[in-house]
């Protein structure tokens, strides 16, 4: 969530940030300001009424003492009893008012929370406004392959070499699914092992999280409630609980320290996870996206960092560099793109995409998005650290990046490394995982 103090201090700046993301939140921001005034007013009213009740209780305590003394002396206590009863009646009425206030306060708080959760993150000020038309390619890395023959599509190459079985994948699980077979399965596993070994060498902690999550994980990551209907759900027939199949390991890693206060000495936390990812991918695929470029299940290694706010920019640069090195290590041609505000996901303040060339698609496809959420996810998940100098808890910053997803690296590798006879040259960094094999050829 965005800090409500920022909204109250400069609502126009928040509205401008939302417009840069191509989201009209003016009415929501105005409602947040109204609700905040109402909530604070109601809390003040409740506190005043509670103070009145406490004053009556204190007064009755004195009156009971006076009544007891009067009874010992045989004096008339009717006036004291009348005042005590009046105070008790007033106290009961105050209790009713406080109960009404608390119910109304809950309704207002719930609406305020809903409004706050619906706001996207503020984009960093250096991002261009608007959508993908304003994305900025920053650099092109690696030699762009040129062919002295007519290059084939990765679907044809994979089928000819027996790497992927698309038809039987559809038979098993429907459209948008495939089976890695033989050397295809080994090549996929080699890619994942290469990614994992690189992250371990960089000192990142390896995590294998559950593949299904509670709703709160998606809420913390900022993917829910807006995108809750775009992921696969598993309903438990014995109760009302629903689990959600992992759309990305980010949703799991982000919640590992939810509702915890970390020590400053523990930061940064550098994690990575391997998981299959499950996406409903509603809507039809474009004709040029046949094959494995877009599917319902794919493998991905995800990088994640929890850090102090002042270390956030350096952490972002580190993740971008790591993603670039992974692709460069494969000898593939790619580019790094700075996304415009409107092309960043709702939870992110900034994002760089690593886009790889897939020749058959005559363009670049994202294989990694490296993003900085600033304190947006930490506020949603109440993830904090205690600063040693002050002893006070502060929200951490969270960052994530694909490191990497294979469903686009695989076809890019196959197409960029193809030879005229339809064989595939294996990148040198993968050969140790494949028994030293240098080329995948048709048997």
Predicted regions and their residues:
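N-terminal alpha-helical targeting/anchoring segments
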Residues: 1-145, 163
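TRNA-recognition modules of translation machinery and tRNA-sensing kinases, especially anticodon-binding
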Residues: 26, 140-443
């Amino acid at each position: 969530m965005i800090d409500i103090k920022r909204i109250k201090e400069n609502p126009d700046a928040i509205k401008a940030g939302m417009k840069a993301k191509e989201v009209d939140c003016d009415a929501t921001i105005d409602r947040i300001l109204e609700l905040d005034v109402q909530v604070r007013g109601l809390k003040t009213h409740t506190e005043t009424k509670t103070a009145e009740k406490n004053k009556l209780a204190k007064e009755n305590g004195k009156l009971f003492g006076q009544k007891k003394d009067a009874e010992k002396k045989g004096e008339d206590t009717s006036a004291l009893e009348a005042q005590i009863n009046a105070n008790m009646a007033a106290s009961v009425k105050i209790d009713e008012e406080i109960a009404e206030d608390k119910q109304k306060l809950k309704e207002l708080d719930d609406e305020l929370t809903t409004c706050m959760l619906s706001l996207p993150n503020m984009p960093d000020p250096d991002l261009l406004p608007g959508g993908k038309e304003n994305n900025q390619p920053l650099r092109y890395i690696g030699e762009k392959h040129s062919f002295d023959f007519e290059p084939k599509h990765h679907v044809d190459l994979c089928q000819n070499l027996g790497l992927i079985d698309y038809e039987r994948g559809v038979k098993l699980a429907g459209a948008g699914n495939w089976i890695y077979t033989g050397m295809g399965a080994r090549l996929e596993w080699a890619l994942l092992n290469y990614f994992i070994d690189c992250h371990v060498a960089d000192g990142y902690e390896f995590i294998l999280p559950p593949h299904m999550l509670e709703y709160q994980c998606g809420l913390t990551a900022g993917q829910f409630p807006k995108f809750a209907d775009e992921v696969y759900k598993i309903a438990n027939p014995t109760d009302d609980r629903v689990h959600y199949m992992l759309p990305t390991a980010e949703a799991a890693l982000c919640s590992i320290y939810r509702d915890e206060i970390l020590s400053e000495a523990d930061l940064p936390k550098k994690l990575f996870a391997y998981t299959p990812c499950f996406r409903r991918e509603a809507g039809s695929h474009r004709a040029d996206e046949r094959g494995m470029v877009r599917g319902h299940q794919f493998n991905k290694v995800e990088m994640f960092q929890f850090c102090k706010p002042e270390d956030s920019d350096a952490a972002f640069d580190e993740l971008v560099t790591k993603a670039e090195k992974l692709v460069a290590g494969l000898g593939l041609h790619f580019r790094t793109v700075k996304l415009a505000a409107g092309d960043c996901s709702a939870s992110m303040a900034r994002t760089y995409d690593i886009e790889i060339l897939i020749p058959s698609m005559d363009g670049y496809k994202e294989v990694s998005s490296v993003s900085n959420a600033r304190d947006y996810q930490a506020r949603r998940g109440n993830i904090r650290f205690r600063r040693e100098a002050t002893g006070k808890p502060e929200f951490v910053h969270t960052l994530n990046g694909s490191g990497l997803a294979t469903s686009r690296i695989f076809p890019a590798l196959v197409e960029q490394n193809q030879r005229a006879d339809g064989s595939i040259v294996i990148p040198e960094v993968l050969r140790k995982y494949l028994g030293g094999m240098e080329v995948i050829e048709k048997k």
